[in-house]
Amino acid sequence: MSENDDLLVPLNDYLAAGVHIGTQQKTKDMEPFIYRTRADGLHVIDVRKTDERIRIAANFLSMYNTDEILVVSRRYYGQKPVSKFAEATGTTAIPGRFVPGTLTNPEYDGYLEPEVIVLTDPRADFQALVEAQSVGIPIVALCDTDNFTGNVDLAIPTNNKGRKALALVYWLLARELLKKLGRLEEDEEFEYDPEDFEGPPPR
């Protein structure tokens, strides 16, 4: 991976945040996004493809009104990033437990009708995935090397378990979405830093 690639942030920022750190498991779905496999069996994600998919996802999400976008994270380290993403972009976030029926039961007080959903991890956010499928809304998901993507419409390959990795990816997705929406100029500084999206450190 060359330092001179035209990336959204310098390559070292991706690496420092651990965006490239996959798992020791891989699925056939995620093989195209794996850069190499280390001697210890850890699969390394190609951050150029992460970068490319963040741009594609931002472009895709910009076709919707922000109040039609739902972002979800059952994962602890994804809860602050999805909350900050929603704050920055005007979307809706569900950090923590996703109550069954949120998308499928109009009788439920917390019932929502988004037009598109963003998942932090298709496995951890399985309830949201199943409900989004059942009501027929597109699914964007952050996918690690061990995820299956058959039910995902747009996968963003990334470490979807790490605190700093999730913060950086959601920060970039928010920034690029605002640019696509014309709410942030191309050369304008984003009012948030990636650190603002970071969840609390381990206790």
Swiss-Prot record:
Signal peptide: none
Record's keyword terms, sorted: Ribonucleoprotein, Ribosomal protein
Top-rank taxon: Archaea
InterPro entries attached to this UniProt entry: Ribosomal_uS2, Ribosomal_uS2_arc, Ribosomal_uS2_bac/mit/plastid, Ribosomal_uS2_CS, Ribosomal_uS2_euk/arc, Ribosomal_uS2_flav_dom_sf
Cystine residue pairs: none
SUPFAM superfamilies in the record: Ribosomal protein S2
GO cellular component: small ribosomal subunit
GO biological process, one term: translation
UniProt GO MF annotations: structural constituent of ribosome
Pfam families associated with the record: Ribosomal_S2
Family stated for the protein in its record: Belongs to the universal ribosomal protein uS2 family.
Entry-linked NCBIfam families: uS2_euk_arch (TIGR01012)
Stored HAMAP family: Ribosomal_uS2_A, Ribosomal_uS2_B
PANTHER family, per database record: 40S RIBOSOMAL PROTEIN SA
Name of the protein in question: Small ribosomal subunit protein uS2
